[in-house]
Design a protein with these regions (language model features):
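Conserved beta-strand hairpin/beta-sheet module of binuclear metal-dependent hydrolase folds
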Residues: 1-48, 140-151
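Short acidic-hydrophobic surface loop/beta-edge motif
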Residues: 6, 18, 116-122
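Short Gly/Pro-enriched turn/cap motifs at secondary-structure boundaries
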Residues: 6-7, 108-110, 130-132
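Residue-level detector of beta-strand structural context in well-folded domains
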Residues: 16, 111, 116-117, 139, ...
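Short catalytic-loop micro-motif centered on adjacent basic/acidic residues
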Residues: 27-29, 54-57, 128-130
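Metallo-beta-lactamase
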Residues: 32-33, 50, 95, 124-211
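Active-site HxH/HxHxD metal-binding segment of metal-dependent hydrolases
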Residues: 33-120, 205-209
Length: 211
């Protein structure tokens, strides 16, 4: 599985395009905010002759959903996420006003993912891990074959997700990381919602919130 990373919007959010040799792809957490950012995303997809088959949110905070409507309209995709994130998604028009940023309302979640579900595209299978704490129903996507993890805002290089937003809970987040993510192999590469990639092994050894 190949992963293309785009850092978008005023929150420096990481948007991911996951694809394989079949050219099918999924777009995870599209944060594209400006026309230039939208063009960066669509140009990459066109240049690589990719076919988007899923639009997925790990969670529905504003920085991760700013491009949902654009991607949904452009590629005819419905939204896939955990059912528990709909309440978060519903709050984002108000959140966008609080931050003073424009927001085209995302479509509602139509396809629901839960713990141990398998999301497929092309020849690739992703296992869904339920990882709440940063948000009430955040999910992570794990590819066992390629040892890659899309973690949203659950785990970062040297840090963890904030828990002071509505629906956040520190104990729940730590429990999610320890029971879901730290069970994975040390070599698993972690792609977070912000910042650089890391590995499970590095975070197990040196993350100050986990040691």
């Amino acid at each position: 599985m190949d992963i293309a990373t785009f850092t978008f919007n005023p929150f420096s959010e990481n948007t991911y395009v996951l694809y394989d040799e079949t050219k099918d792809c999924i777009i995870v957490d599209p944060g594209c905010y400006t026309e230039e950012e939208q063009t960066q995303l669509t140009d990459f997809i066109a240049q690589h002759a990719l076919v988007p088959v899923h639009l997925v949110n790990t969670h529905c905070h504003i920085d991760h959903v700013l491009g949902n409507k654009f991607v949904s309209d452009r590629y005819g995709l419905s939204l896939t996420s955990h059912a528990g994130e709909q309440v978060v998604l519903d709050a984002q028009p108000t959140v966008s006003q609080m931050y003073g940023i424009s927001y085209l309302r995302s479509p509602d979640i139509k396809t629901f993912l839960a713990q141990d579900d398998i999301l497929t595209f092309g020849n690739t299978s992703l296992k869904v891990l339920f990882t709440p704490g940063h948000s009430p129903a955040s999910i992570s996507l794990y590819n066992h074959e390629s040892m890659q993890l899309i973690a949203g805002d659950v785990l970062f290089d040297g840090s963890i997700g904030r828990t002071d937003l509505p629906g956040g809970d520190f104990k729940t987040l730590i429990d999610s990381i320890k029971t879901q993510l730290l069970r994975l192999d040390d070599k698993v590469v972690v792609y977070s919602g912000h910042g650089e990639i890391t590995t499970i092994g590095k975070e197990r050894r040196s993350n100050p919130f986990l040691t």
